[in-house]
């Protein structure tokens, strides 16, 4: 099986924070683009700006921990002031270290059973 760790994070946007959200997205995308172990990082907003989903994909648990460290150091406080998590689904077989971080964010885990990525 693959070592890839990915997730889909569903969020509600705090009232009055949409401008802050757009600025934060730009900063986080640029910072994450520099992480060599990040395979995919996409943000999506509803038309009214009230709902946000983030799709993230990392080469392995080590790359995931690099991202989580950067997130915690640079963005976590502002992120949590802009969003309320409403769902967090993690895919793959993350390490115990990764699970230790993601458990605190309310993650649910789904293990791989088949399929492929091109």
Regions found by a protein language model. Name each.
Residues 5-12:
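Active-site-flanking beta-strand signature of metal-NTP-handling nucleotidyl enzymes
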Residues 12-22:
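Short, surface-exposed ligand-recognition loops at beta-strand->loop->(often short) alpha-helix junctions
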Residues 24-25, 71:
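Hydrophobic alpha-helical membrane-association signature
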Residues 1-5, 45-49, 80-82:
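Short, flexible turn/loop "capping" segments at secondary-structure junctions
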Residues 33-39, 48, 57-113:
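An amphipathic, aromatic/His-enriched active-site/gating alpha helix that lines ligand/cofactor pockets
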Residues 41-43:
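Conserved beta3 strand of the protein kinase N-lobe
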């Amino acid at each position: 099986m693959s070592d890839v760790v990915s997730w889909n994070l569903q969020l509600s946007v705090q009232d009055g924070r949409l401008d802050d959200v757009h600025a934060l997205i730009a900063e986080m995308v640029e910072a994450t683009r520099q992480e060599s172990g990040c395979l995919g990082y996409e943000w999506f907003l509803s038309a009214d700006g009230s709902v946000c989903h983030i799709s993230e994909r990392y080469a392995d648990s080590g790359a995931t921990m690099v991202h989580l460290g950067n997130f915690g150091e640079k963005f976590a406080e502002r992120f949590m002031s802009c969003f309320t998590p409403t769902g967090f689904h993690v895919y793959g077989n993350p390490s115990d270290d990764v699970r230790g971080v993601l458990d605190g964010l309310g993650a649910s885990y789904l293990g791989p059973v088949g399929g492929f990525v091109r």
